[in-house]
């Protein structure tokens, strides 16, 4: 869409942060209003992350107004909230391309702009990176400032606290801004806190505090009295004791939608030494009532009509794999009170809403704490329960040592329901589920299953749930199932594949939900088609049978080729000295960028046409 200067006259003056800083302060509330309306107009036309950005408009304007970005370095955690940042940093006219193939990246991305200091997508990384950047800036000696913005969800992760503990030890000059949208501030309390924050962040107070420490350092009773007086004043309205104990100078909470008040507080804090912590209160979805009322639904949106206040409903077609999992979870829990389900802050995405309502005492959302989720599951298993960890492929990476050390070595029966496996689409490199088969396959005695449809997915979940000799995993993709009939649940024989079609010369060994595309190729080439089902243990007998009865083999998977299921097939053949040629089809050796699942599969040759072309070229 073209930018309408008449509709956004103040925003039209800002093509860069340098131009932003030329605006008089009095015009900034109007700029915030236009920026919020432009964000609504843009995202409703193109889709994207929405409610978080609406909540950070004033903060974004204030930070770029006070700090000399990009010389001063601004780091956004996760990046869902960074759309206003992109708009103000030279990407205003391209914001309608965000999350689209070839368009703006969905998160801050170093290769896209000098303003994007840290490429992000996963949570809770900002403070750790910020400390490193602040230490480097100190050694550089050019008075470059460092600011990290982290949300109330992301700050619950252990990594954030590890970083803050380190910052309190080495005391770099940096600012951490906590964007807290979990609660609202009443007018009176908010006004009092805003006034106190400006007082406590001011130079006079800071000078008195530091000077007093020096003057009375040799007089313990007076020093202790001053310390207690300060704590008493701050403790009346400031919930910052934890951050103070970690070594930060805590200021807040303040109204995150008062842009002029934020500017005053940020200017006061800009030149303070040591680690600083500013706690701001915002409302997710601010300025668009439907998003304010339901920020979870409006977190990420398809194209929609803003005047209606409603998102388009799904067509009521096939259920998603997440829903298949959620339905199976409820069905199984109703029969077995030992079932416990765990998610690291992905209740909606993992299809667990109904389960959480029906079985609240057996549902555990551990927040953004993947490591804890896995070891918590280990403890439940030790206690005689049957834990299921529902987690996205890309987030399970964050708990790899816990899978190894706390679950697998102890042979604990923990079932991993791995959602968003393979290509996920618009969220790009940081969210593709490209590596789970590779990083799980090397774990001794791990059972790994890859369903080809929703019925097989249910059977595999059932099989894994009843497997008691160690951990198991079922990986399934983002998106809808294929529409097969659901049959009664029964355990599958571990490590056994099935032949779906008999052909000649060529055998296609398929792992997972690319099966419909592989079936088209098998039909076209008159190839044998095998549903391998298990990545570990592999059906070695079936692989050797296919090698003996065919001239060539092709493996198909939506995982990195390196270390994936196809690599396992190669290992079996080499171990048995079988000289049959094998073509491995899967994800190539680079991070897969954004685009729809269909676009990326076509580009990577993972649709039927692409697979057939690869096979013909290889056989030629």
Swiss-Prot record:
Keywords: Isoprene biosynthesis, Magnesium, Metal-binding, Thiamine biosynthesis, Thiamine pyrophosphate, Transferase. It catalyses: D-glyceraldehyde 3-phosphate + pyruvate + H(+) = 1-deoxy-D-xylulose 5-phosphate + CO2. Binds 1 Mg(2+) ion per subunit. It comes from the Bacteria. GO terms for cellular component: cytosol. SUPFAM superfamilies: Thiamin diphosphate-binding fold (THDP-binding), TK C-terminal domain-like. Disulfide bonds: none annotated. Its cofactor is Mg(2+); thiamine diphosphate. One of its GO terms (biological process) is thiamine biosynthetic process. Signal peptide: none annotated. Thiamine diphosphate binds at residues 80, 121-123, 153-154, 181, 288, 370. Mg(2+) binds at residues 152, 181. Pathway: Metabolic intermediate biosynthesis; 1-deoxy-D-xylulose 5-phosphate biosynthesis; 1-deoxy-D-xylulose 5-phosphate from D-glyceraldehyde 3-phosphate and pyruvate: step 1/1. Belongs to the transketolase family. DXPS subfamily. PANTHER family: 1-D-DEOXYXYLULOSE 5-PHOSPHATE SYNTHASE-RELATED (PTHR43322), 1-DEOXY-D-XYLULOSE-5-PHOSPHATE SYNTHASE, CHLOROPLASTIC (PTHR43322:SF5). Homodimer. This is 1-deoxy-D-xylulose-5-phosphate synthase. It comes from Escherichia coli O1:K1 / APEC. The gene is dxs.
């Amino acid at each position: 869409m073209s930018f309408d200067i008449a509709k956004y006259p103040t925003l039209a003056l800002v093509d860069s942060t340098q131009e932003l800083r030329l605006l008089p302060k009095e015009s900034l509330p109007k700029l915030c209003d236009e920026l919020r309306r432009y964000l609504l107009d843009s995202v409703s036309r193109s889709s994207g992350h929405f409610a978080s950005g609406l909540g950070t408009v004033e903060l974004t304007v204030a930070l770029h107004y006070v700090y000399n970005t990009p010389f001063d370095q601004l780091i956004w955690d996760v990046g869902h909230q960074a759309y206003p940042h992109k708009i103000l940093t030279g990407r205003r006219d391209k914001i309608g391309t965000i999350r689209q193939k070839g368009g703006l990246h969905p998160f801050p991305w170093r290769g896209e702009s000098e303003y994007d200091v840290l490429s992000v997508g996963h949570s809770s990384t900002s403070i750790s990176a910020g400390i490193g950047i602040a230490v480097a800036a100190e050694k550089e000696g050019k008075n470059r400032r460092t600011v990290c913005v982290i949300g109330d969800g992301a700050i619950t992760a252990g990594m954030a606290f590890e970083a803050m503990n380190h910052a309190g030890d080495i005391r770099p000059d940096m600012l951490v801004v906590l964007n807290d949208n979990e609660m609202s501030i009443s007018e009176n309390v908010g006004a009092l806190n805003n006034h106190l924050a400006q007082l406590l962040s001011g130079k006079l107070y800071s000078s008195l505090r530091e000077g007093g420490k020096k003057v009375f350092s040799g007089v313990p009773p007076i020093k202790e009295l001053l310390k207690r007086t300060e704590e008493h004043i701050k403790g009346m309205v400031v919930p910052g004791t934890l951050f103070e104990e970690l070594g930060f100078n805590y200021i807040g909470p303040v109204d995150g939608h008062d842009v002029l008040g934020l500017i005053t507080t940020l200017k006061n804090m800009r030149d303070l030494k040591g680690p600083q912590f500013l706690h701001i209160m915002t409302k997710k979805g601010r300025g668009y009532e439907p998003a304010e009322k339901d920020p979870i639904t409006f977190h990420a949106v398809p194209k929609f009509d803003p005047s209606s206040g409603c998102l388009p409903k799904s067509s009521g077609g096939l259920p998603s794999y997440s829903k298949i999992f959620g339905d199976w979870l409820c069905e199984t829990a109703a029969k077995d009170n030992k079932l416990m389900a765990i998610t690291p802050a992905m209740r909606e995405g993992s299809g667990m809403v109904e389960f959480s309502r029906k079985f609240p005492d057996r549902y555990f959302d551990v927040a953004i704490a993947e490591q804890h989720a896995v070891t918590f599951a280990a403890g439940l298993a030790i206690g005689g329960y049957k834990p299921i960890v529902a987690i996205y492929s890309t987030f399970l990476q964050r708990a790899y040592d816990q899978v190894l050390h706390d679950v697998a070595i102890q042979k604990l029966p923990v079932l991993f329901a791995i959602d968003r496996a393979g290509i996920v689409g618009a969220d790009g490199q940081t969210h593709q589920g490209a590596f789970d088969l590779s990083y799980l396959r090397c774990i001794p005695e791990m059972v790994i299953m890859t369903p080809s449809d929703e019925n097989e997915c249910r059977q595999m979940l059932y099989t894994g749930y009843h497997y008691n000799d160690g951990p198991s995993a079922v990986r399934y993709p983002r998106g809808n199932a294929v529409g097969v009939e659901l049959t009664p649940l029964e355990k599958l024989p571990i490590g056994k594949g099935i032949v779906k079609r008999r052909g000649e010369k060529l055998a296609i060994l398929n792992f997972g939900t690319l099966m419909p595309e592989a079936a088209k190729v098998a039909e076209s080439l008159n190839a044998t088609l095998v549903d391998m089902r298990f990545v570990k243990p592999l059906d070695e007998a079936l692989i050797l049978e296919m090698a003996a009865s065919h001239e060539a083999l092709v493996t198909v998977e939506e995982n990195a080729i390196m270390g994936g299921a196809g690599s396992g097939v190669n290992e079996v053949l080499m171990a048995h000295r079988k000289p049959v040629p094998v073509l491995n089809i899967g994800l190539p050796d680079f991070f897969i960028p954004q685009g729809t699942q269909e676009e990326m599969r076509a580009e990577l040759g993972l649709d039927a046409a692409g697979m057939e072309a690869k096979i013909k070229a290889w056989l030629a």
